């Protein structure tokens, strides 16, 4: 993946728990310079604290991408601080469960290109499937960038309509849990 635009302009992670850390680890090992990454996280992990990134520091003026990875219940408090980047130059990529594109547009404004992505649990070990859906401002280059970044945690699937996200979540999100349960039952038999 070509990280040149991100390396020059920066990537902001709003929240960096298990999924965000798994992605960042993949990006750094694939050549993204650590100094191109800004993380806003009130409770950073020990791993995150030893990375050579900008942790809870002043943000770049025009980042290439803001990855929103906060828990849904924290979204209303966390996202407004990113609204200054809603001018159309910065791509917003959300992996926050259950938060619609319309919810992001209400906070970020009508000019922000937004992609909603829903990774499943196996993504934490790089074997996931992530469904993607974007707003009307999304161009092919945005999808290519999102797919390249999300490739760090597995495969991606483009959806035609955001409404399909619920169906995908039911199958890809719950499916692995059922398989793991079935394996446990077979092992116990």
Walk through the language-model features, giving the residues of each.
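Rossmann-like NAD(P)(H) cofactor-binding subdomain of soluble oxidoreductases
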Residues: 23-24, 45-47, 56-132
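Glycine- and other small-residue-rich loops at beta-strand/loop junctions that grip anionic moieties
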Residues: 68, 93, 135, 157, ...
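NAD(P)+-binding Rossmann beta1-loop-alpha1 motif at the extreme N-terminus of oxidoreductases
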Residues: 1-57, 127-128
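Internal alpha-helical scaffold of NAD(P)-dependent oxidoreductase catalytic cores
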Residues: 85, 103-113, 129-167, 180-189
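A generic structural signal for alpha->beta connector loops
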Residues: 34-36, 52, 89, 111-114, ...
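Solvent-exposed alpha-helices and their adjacent loops that cap or buttress functional pockets
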Residues: 3-6, 31, 59, 85-87, ...
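A general structural signal for well-ordered alpha-helical segments in protein cores
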Residues: 16, 20, 63, 75, ...
């Amino acid at each position: 993946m070509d990280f040149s635009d991100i390396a020059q302009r920066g990537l902001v992670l709003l929240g960096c728990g298990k999924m965000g850390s798994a992605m960042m680890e993949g990006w750094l090992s694939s050549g993204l310079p650590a100094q191109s990454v800004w993380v806003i996280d009130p409770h950073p992990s020990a791993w995150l604290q030893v990375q050579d990134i900008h942790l809870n520091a002043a943000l770049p003026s025009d980042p290439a991408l803001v990855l929103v990875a906060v828990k849904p219940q924290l979204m209303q408090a966390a996202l407004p601080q990113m609204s200054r980047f809603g001018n159309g130059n910065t791509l917003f990529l959300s992996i926050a469960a259950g938060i619609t594109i319309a919810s992001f547009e209400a906070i970020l404004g009508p000019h922000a290109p937004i992609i909603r992505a829903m990774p499943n649990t196996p993504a934490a070990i790089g074997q996931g499937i992530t469904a993607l859906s974007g707003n009307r401002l999304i161009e092919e280059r945005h999808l290519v960038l999102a797919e390249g970044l999300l490739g760090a945690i597995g495969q991606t699937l483009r959806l035609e309509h955001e409404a399909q996200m619920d169906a995908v979540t039911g199958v890809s999100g719950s499916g692995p849990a059922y398989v793991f349960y079935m394996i446990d039952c077979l092992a116990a038999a």
